[in-house]
Amino acid sequence: MPNTVPEALADLPYFVACLGIALFLFTLGLAAYVAVAARRDMRLIAEGNVAAAAGMTGAFIGFALPLASAVIRSEALLGMLVWGGVALLAQLLVLAGLRLMLSSLVRSMRDGQVASGVFLGAVAVSVGILNAACLTY
């Protein structure tokens, strides 16, 4: 147990590095997802499409879950970077595939059907939970 403030803050550089890497990977994953699967959805969100916002919110949470798992399980920054990248790539591939398989739901979400957006968001979160659970290295 640390007895002084400097002792308590000894791990601050590791925290800052860890947070920086996690935010970088999160931003990279979301940018790739938007570029590959959801570019049009961002415009729809800007226009007030609640269904698209619900779907994108699920995707954001779905990306954060496996990344958080990689952060928690990593013993070093390099491991976090590698496994965080693996987790985000897996999430991106699965979500892109699901959007192709569920293309009619994607279309109805883009048409403003909130139920479709909520469902697609829930699928993204569910995939993120499974992805996070599989990071048991």
Regions found by a protein language model. Give the residues of each.
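Hydrophobic alpha-helical transmembrane segments
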Residues: 12, 16-20, 80-85, 118-119
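C-terminal ends of transmembrane helices
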Residues: 30-44, 94-108
